[in-house]
């Protein structure tokens, strides 16, 4: 199936990917994460996020968060209100993370003409 090479559409957009290994209960982690997500959702430049849990491992999660640009993401992390959220997540989990930019996209339905591509 064809993919679309990044053609400058949303070229500034960045995706933060964070993989968590949870040491406490999944329900507690998800509750703390929901509060963290609500904090980020109020920040300028936040686009969306998805928290995924691995099917066969209750303690393995991945968060995928999209931001309009790197500066917006950086400003959100610098907000004084972020530290309590980071501390709460670190108390329940360890994580690995990275900031990514799109290189190829396959829009829903496999449309490579550009309609439906975001």
UniProtKB/Swiss-Prot annotation:
User: Mutating residue 63 to A: what's the consequence?
Assistant: Loss of monooxygenase activity
Sequence intervals crossing the membrane: none
To which pathway does this protein belong? Antibiotic biosynthesis
State the reactions this protein catalyses: deoxynogalonate + O2 = nogalonate + H2O + H(+)
What positions are marked as the site Important for catalytic activity?
18, 63, 67
| Superkingdom to which the source organism belongs | Bacteria
- What protein name does the entry list? Deoxynogalonate monooxygenase
- Provide the species name: Streptomyces nogalater
């Amino acid at each position: 199936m064809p993919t679309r090479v990044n053609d400058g559409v949303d070229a500034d957009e960045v995706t933060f990917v964070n993989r968590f290994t949870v040491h406490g209960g999944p329900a507690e982690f998800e509750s703390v994460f929901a509060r963290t997500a609500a904090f980020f959702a109020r920040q300028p430049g936040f686009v969306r996020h998805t928290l995924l849990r691995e099917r066969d491992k209750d303690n393995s999660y991945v968060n995928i968060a999209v931001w309009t640009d790197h500066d917006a993401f950086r400003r959100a992390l610098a907000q004084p209100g972020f530290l309590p959220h980071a501390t709460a997540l670190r108390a329940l989990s360890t994580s690995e993370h990275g900031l990514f930019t799109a290189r190829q996209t396959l829009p829903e339905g496999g449309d490579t003409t550009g309609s439906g591509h975001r």
